[in-house]
């Protein structure tokens, strides 16, 4: 999603600019002043509503203006009608996708033209983004499920009509029910270090590893990453993470059945985020039939009397459509079984 409200920050004179990710409530926040007006922006991914939410506010009534469009880097049909932007298409592998941007303002006007929506003279603006594909994690159904439009019809409009405060409250309540389970205390950081921005503290830590508060923050940041990228009913955390910046990420953002997946889930049980482990457990169960077929087709795995093996194992790299590549990782199946045991034990 392209928003001129975000990009114009780099073109105008601004002061008191701050941006932060609040690990306590899982909300990204931006604040700055320009021409005597204070602008605030908040964004979060809502599990209860299954949407991304962005809220823009201006301290002076009628001061928020922005154009919204979709910068889609794959072939897609993009259109705007009323307060809704829609984009849809089919990827080269046959997977269908659709996304909707639904815009609601307080004050001002909303108009659509071509593939763009313009907001003028508003006090505030809430943007709800909903996206779906027809992917289904089921080998027997060839990984294809319900049409994305039918999925979106069930919840997108309802989420967009919900008051921003209610969306935010529901998100925070669900997020904190998991995040607040664990607190750590590694000591106290010196005041002159604690007041520095995180990038400077990370740099200073390399020279003098004495910043207990930073260590606590990084521990909780790791929990935040898993909490935000692996929930029941979703795909598990992948190589680059769900929220990486790429359309075409390195290694196709697949799964490497080795320490890459293992590191992502180190904190699932010890850090009291057991629900996050469920996505990996479901993924292993869904991939097992395809892995069994591939394992039995490999004659090198045959038993001494020449029969295919009864079990299965994995190759090092794997994608969500059951594809396996690179070298066989023969003990990989046992390692996945250990994850399942740890989850239920």
Language model features: what each stretch is:
Residues 1-6, 10:
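Single conserved hydrophobic/aromatic residue that forms the stacking wall/gate
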Residues 21-24, 32-72, 117, 121:
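Acidic, contiguous internal or C-terminal segments within carbohydrate-active enzymes
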Residues 54-55, 225-228, 261-274, 334-345:
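Alpha-helical support elements that line or immediately flank enzyme active sites
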Residues 162-166, 188, 206-215, 226, ...:
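Structural helix-adjacent loops and short alpha-helical linkers that scaffold large soluble proteins
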Residues 169-212, 216, 233, 238-245, ...:
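Active-site-proximal, well-structured secondary-structure segments within enzyme catalytic domains
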Residues 204-215, 248-258, 320-331:
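Solvent-exposed loop and edge beta-strand segments that line ligand/cofactor-binding
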Residues 219, 226, 257-306:
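Carboxylate/His-rich catalytic cores and anion/metal-binding grooves
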Residues 291-335:
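Active-site-adjacent "gating/activation" loops or surface patches in catalytic cores
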């Amino acid at each position: 999603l392209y928003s001129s409200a975000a990009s114009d920050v780099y073109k105008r004179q601004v002061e008191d600019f701050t941006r932060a990710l609040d690990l306590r409530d899982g909300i990204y926040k931006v604040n700055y002043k320009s021409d005597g007006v204070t602008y605030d922006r908040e964004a979060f991914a809502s599990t209860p509503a299954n949407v991304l939410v962005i809220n823009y506010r201006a301290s002076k009534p009628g001061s928020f203006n922005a154009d919204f469009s979709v910068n889609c880097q794959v072939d897609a049909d993009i259109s705007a009608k009323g307060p809704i932007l829609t984009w849809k298409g089919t990827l080269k592998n046959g997977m269908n996708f659709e996304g909707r941007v639904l815009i609601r303002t307080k004050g001002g006007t909303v108009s659509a033209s071509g593939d763009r929506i313009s907001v003028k003279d508003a006090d505030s603006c809430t943007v709800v983004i909903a996206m779906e594909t027809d992917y289904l994690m089921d080998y027997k159904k060839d990984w294809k499920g319900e049409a994305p439009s039918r999925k979106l019809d069930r919840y997108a409009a309802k989420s967009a009509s919900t008051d921003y405060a209610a969306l935010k409250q529901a998100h925070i309540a669900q997020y904190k029910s998991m995040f607040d389970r664990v607190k750590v205390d590694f000591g106290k950081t010196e005041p002159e270090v604690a007041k520095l921005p995180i990038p400077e503290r990370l740099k200073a830590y390399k020279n003098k590893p004495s910043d207990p508060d930073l260590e606590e923050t990084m521990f909780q940041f790791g929990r935040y990453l898993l909490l935000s990228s692996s929930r029941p009913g979703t795909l598990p955390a992948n190589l680059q993470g769900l929220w990486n910046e790429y359309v075409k990420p390195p290694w196709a953002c697949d799964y490497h059945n080795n320490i890459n997946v293992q590191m992502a889930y180190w904190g699932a049980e010890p850090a009291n985020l057991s629900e996050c482990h469920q996505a990996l457990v479901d993924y292993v169960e869904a991939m097992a039939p395809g892995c069994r077929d591939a394992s039995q087709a490999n004659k090198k795995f045959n038993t001494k009397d020449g029969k295919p093996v009864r079990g299965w194992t994995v190759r090092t790299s794997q994608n969500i459509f059951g594809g396996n590549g690179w070298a066989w990782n023969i003990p990989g199946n046992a390692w996945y079984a250990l994850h399942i045991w740890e989850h239920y034990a």
